[in-house]
Amino acid sequence: MLVPTVIEQTSRGERAYDIYSRLLKDRIIMLSGEVNDQMANTIIAQLLFLDAQDSDKDISIYINSPGGSVTAGLAIMDTMNFIKSDVQTIAMGMAASMASVLLSAGTKGKRFALPNSTVLIHQPLGGAQGQQTEIEIAAREILKTRKRLNQILADNSGQTFEKLQADTDRDNYMTAQEAKDYGLIDDIMVNQPK
């Protein structure tokens, strides 16, 4: 993937940044693509760095992701909760699966979606192979993970655990307004006047 470069004028001349480094200077983190361990390590490092720089300023995470690894996503969420800085989450495009959990885990009152974004909640995906006992162990772990994710979504949205169990039984797509009504986000960011 080609990453654009931004040229800035400084007192010492010109300075070139890749676009993500430039956004990081403004305390903006981009969470895009599949949630995996490599992405999680990068996001966590950025969160820790920005919090160490100034824990009184908000950090914004823009989310456009189909989801991915539950353990990687929970590591990001735990770090969001661990740091002192408030974390603003903004869905743009798609916040699906684990990405919807991260969207809802932003600081209450600071969870947003752009008007045409989509939020998807569902049960975790998994598979198992091997001997019967190994399949049973894997199935129990998937059920435990589903219960944990539904409890997190219930806590973040204000919905009951039972409602989350029912609503995540199958893919549940939501518009930005539906995600707001459900409690996954606090508001919809409207277009700035031109």
Curated annotation (Swiss-Prot):
Active site: S97, H122
Pfam families: CLP_protease
Signal peptide residue numbers: none
Transmembrane annotation, as ranges: none
Catalysis performed (reactions): Hydrolysis of proteins to small peptides in the presence of ATP and magnesium. alpha-casein is the usual test substrate. In the absence of ATP, only oligopeptides shorter than five residues are hydrolyzed (such as succinyl-Leu-Tyr-|-NHMec, and Leu-Tyr-Leu-|-Tyr-Trp, in which cleavage of the -Tyr-|-Leu- and -Tyr-|-Trp bonds also occurs)
Subcellular location: Cytoplasm
Entries under CDD domains matching the protein: S14_ClpP_2 (cd07017)
EC number: 3.4.21.92
A GO MF term: serine-type endopeptidase activity
Any one Gene Ontology BP term: protein quality control for misfolded or incompletely synthesized proteins
Class in the EC hierarchy, top level: hydrolase
InterPro entries from the UniProt entry: ClpP, ClpP/crotonase-like_dom_sf, ClpP/TepA, ClpP_His_AS, ClpP_Ser_AS
Gene Ontology CC terms: cytoplasm; endopeptidase Clp complex
Assigned keywords, A-Z: Cytoplasm, Hydrolase, Protease, Serine protease
PROSITE patterns listed in its UniProt record: CLP_PROTEASE_HIS, CLP_PROTEASE_SER
Subunit structure: Fourteen ClpP subunits assemble into 2 heptameric rings which stack back to back to give a disk-like structure with a central cavity, resembling the structure of eukaryotic proteasomes.
Function description: Cleaves peptides in various proteins in a process that requires ATP hydrolysis. Has a chymotrypsin-like activity. Plays a major role in the degradation of misfolded proteins.
Family annotation (NCBIfam families): clpP, PRK00277.1, PRK12553.1
Family, as annotated: Belongs to the peptidase S14 family.
Protein name per UniProt: ATP-dependent Clp protease proteolytic subunit
Organism: Latilactobacillus sakei subsp. sakei (strain 23K) (Lactobacillus sakei subsp. sakei)
Gene name for this UniProt entry: clpP
